[in-house]
Amino acid sequence: MHNPRLLVIAGCNGSGKSSFSKFLVPSSNTIPFDYDSHFLSHYRALIDIDIKEQMAHNLASTDLNDEIEEAWKSRKDFAFETNFDTEPMYWPNQFKAKGYDLFLLFLCLDSIELANKRVLIRVENGGHFVPKYEVERRYYAGFENLNKYYAQFDFIDIFEGSAHARIPEHMATVENGKVVFSTLDRYLYLKNLIPELISR
């Protein structure tokens, strides 16, 4: 019997985490926790007060914690979406300590401009707004952390998601810190973003 799995679905804003996870996540009953969706749902339900945004964040965080606790108790697989920017290893380390295998699915975009464009399209369709400076910060931080922490995951798949209305292209697989398949060197924009991975 295999260990339960944590699947981290990572990438910058607009990379397609929510749109494509159903195509890319291994077949299971696991529905990835979408923090942004929970936040937006709570935000819209709250009355307009000064601390409305913070309250919505607190409620979304509570939702995440509750679902994680339930997964731990039942030893079920768990998945969540993240920009992989702030404390990216906090939850993976917690799951590892609980005996979970760590899987990372990372979606790449070839520019910050494309990320901003997709955020604006999402806003036009009822999604949440993210300021340009925050999109840029998350873009670089996500790649920096991928380059830094990739060896701590048991299994990683990296995808290129810049093409419009197409399922992302598989670029690399990493198993226990060892690159077993890679076309990363074909993508010039990745050269300075994940140099450690490309050199493997």
Language model regions located:
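Short hydrophobic/aromatic beta-strand immediately N-terminal to the Walker A/P-loop
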Residues: 6-8
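The conserved Walker
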Residues: 12-13
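Conserved substrate/cofactor phosphate-moiety recognition/catalytic segment
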Residues: 21-74
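Glycine-rich phosphate-binding loop used to anchor ATP phosphates in small-molecule kinases
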Residues: 56-106, 142
